[in-house]
Amino acid sequence: MWKRWCDYKEEILRILILGASGTVGSALYKCLSDQYDVYGTYNKNKPDDVCTWNVYKYDIADFLVLESILNDVKPDLIISSLTGNFEHQLNVHRHIAEYLKESLGRCIFLSTANVFDGSPDSSHTEVDTPYPISQYGKYKYSCEQLLLDYLDNRLLIVRLPRTLSSKDAIIEVQQVENGQPVYANLYKSYNTAVNVAKAIQFCIEANRYGIVHLTSNDIISASEFMELLLSHYEKNLTYAKDFFTTESYCHALGCDDPALVRNSDDGNFYLTLSSINTDLVTNFGISCKSIIHSL
């Protein structure tokens, strides 16, 4: 029988983070390392402030390397925060699902608000049925289904909105300075990598499985969020503001058929998450303004 997280008291839980050099992956590594035996992978950029012997260079196309890492680490829990080629990633998740099914280990899969990008008519909670039309959203939803089929209640799916570090926020400002338009009728929810990492640690300690949305308490238009960012960084500039149509929204997602988009009645597009998990909202709910002030 599989162990609950809290059963690992005498023996420290061994965690493997796939994608430990990314925004959320690196925050997870730093957050979890004090309490657990944490290992990570990276592709090009080795994570800062980590133990040299606990990270592995890994190209997701190389399955022999993945098998070697799994045999070396023998993880009780795998947290997937991978990026890269969708087909390769899907194969990686099939491989780790097979490994964890046999070892009775557990998995936390970091998913996205884009599993709902075909229905920008409202915000979506954990009980809503995904409807992706972008390749990215379709891939993430395929991974969710694959892992669920293999692991059932040994899987936690964590769906994330736009999740920022200080570096990410600065890049967004620079893109606007370089002329990238900001959409006034595109609404998003947000979070910070540090807050997400703390919430995931809470989920580990609470033996959580199923689906959770780790998101801000409020939603805000992309242009309003940019105004707050510019004010935070004391930038006084006029930027290009645009408005999505169904056609341009569909095109931005790489979809050729606007008829697939489920439109809202108010002309806005909501790529947002909400949560019905009151304990997570109570402990880790954060406003968009607080997100910016924490960067």
PLM feature spans:
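Amphipathic terminal alpha-helices
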Residues: W2-R4, S264-L295
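N-terminal Rossmann NAD(P)H-binding glycine-rich loop of SDR-like oxidoreductase domains
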Residues: L13-Q35
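N-terminal Rossmann-fold cofactor-binding loop
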Residues: G40-P47, I60
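Conserved Rossmann-fold cofactor-binding substructure of NAD(P)-dependent oxidoreductases
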Residues: K57-K74
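NAD(P)-cofactor binding segment of oxidoreductase domains
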Residues: N71, D76-I108
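Catalytic helix-loop patch of NAD(P)-dependent Rossmann-fold dehydrogenases
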Residues: V115-V158, S165
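NAD(P)-dependent short-chain dehydrogenase/reductase
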Residues: Q145-N195
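Mid/C-terminal beta-alpha module of Rossmann-like enzyme folds, strongest
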Residues: A199-C250, F284-L295
